[in-house]
Amino acid sequence: MLIFAPAKINLTLDILGKRPDGYHELWSVMQAITLGDLVEIEPAEGINLRVVGADLPVDSTNIAFKAVQALRAATGKAIGASITIRKKIPLEAGLAGGSADGAAVLYGLNKLYNLNLSQEELLEIGAKISADIPFCLTGGTALVQGIGEKVKKLPPLKKGYFVIYKPPFGISTKEAYLRLAGKDLTKEHPDREKILKALGKENLEDLGKFLKNLLEISALEINPEIYKYKNELLNLKPLGVLMSGSGSALFALTENLKKAKEIYYQLTLPGQKFIVRPYAAGPTCLKL
């Protein structure tokens, strides 16, 4: 089975506070995009994982490997798989590359082994592996709350293009959250009502105005180059620019492909860049 595993961006990321268990309560609008990994899964005796296109571990520290183990634990069945991941999503970017792969494995094995697990059951299993897996399983446009386990589908964003720019460095998610500790974020919170209204009307101009990610504050402290790169993108006059997740990837929102191409070709910073569109689904089976 060949599965497309879409990446995600955060159109907004608000942090409401830290829970007693150390996790942070979030309020985030996430969007799946047409950039993604290809995950090939075949039934097997044990767990055999191969990654092409990135230097990643292929043992139990890999989220895709953990997904097989989690399904075994949840079902009590000796599920095995031979998995090949062809990486397209940049690493340490805030684009949920690992979680996208984990979601694809849960989705694929549920079908391959006829486990008949409901979407709700898959979300519950996924949440125990990674905070982004519940959204990655859902895809499209969604409001994500809690620590990532509460996912509410929103009307899909059908308009617009995004130019994704990944600098030649990553940002540690753990450090990004740690840097927020003790900061007064009272005036930093996004306008939730306005971003939901802009999305509901598919008003891209307003959406661009209200893009907000609190983790940008700490990312700028960790690596001030982010500020320079963001300004470079803003100078190219998109509708808005934001860092996705804990970074380091930035995205520029545009109203059409012509403007997206203009930004893409004028952007001469070191790193990776992509033109993508909103994607209305989660993991998608391309071939049985």
Curated annotation (Swiss-Prot):
An example GO BP is: terpenoid biosynthetic process
- SUPFAM superfamilies in UniProt: GHMP Kinase, C-terminal domain, Ribosomal protein S5 domain 2-like
Active-site residues? 8, 132
Under InterPro entries, the record lists:
GHMP_kinase_C_dom (IPR013750), GHMP_kinase_C_sf (IPR036554), GHMP_kinase_N_dom (IPR006204), IspE (IPR004424), Ribosomal_Su5_D2-typ_SF (IPR020568), Ribsml_uS5_D2-typ_fold_subgr (IPR014721)
Binding-site list for ATP:
90-100
Q: Which reaction does it catalyse?
A: 4-CDP-2-C-methyl-D-erythritol + ATP = 4-CDP-2-C-methyl-D-erythritol 2-phosphate + ADP + H(+)
Question: Under what name is this protein listed?
Answer: 4-diphosphocytidyl-2-C-methyl-D-erythritol kinase
Q: Native species of this protein?
A: Carboxydothermus hydrogenoformans (strain ATCC BAA-161 / DSM 6008 / Z-2901)
